[in-house]
Amino acid sequence: MTPQPAKVQAISDTYELLRLAAARRQAVAAIYDGLPRLLCPHVLGRKSGQLHALFYQFGGSSRSGLPVGPEGMGDWRCLAVEKLSEVELRADAWHTEPRSRRQTCVDEIDFDVDAQPAEDPQ
């Protein structure tokens, strides 16, 4: 058996894919800290010079677990883009909840879903 190369994405490619997903209000699947996650990217930019994103995680795993609320399972997550791997667009429905407080995940905002008009589904 020939070993297969690991699926590697450049950080810039990952970031652009997340930006596209956010603009389309489309979910992504990814690996973060070795755990599979289903995420909806809401805010993208930099914190202390590093690329970060604020996601709503609605599925997959997490070391801290996912709470179950009235809308189902989910929670807000601030994740470093460089720690994401195997990021793929998904056909899952867009998931979100009102932000209970001002986000502090991203200092220099490049993209915020809440500041963009929703795309018209065709």
PLM feature spans:
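Core beta-strand-centered patch of the WYL/Sm-like small regulatory domain
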Residues: 2-122
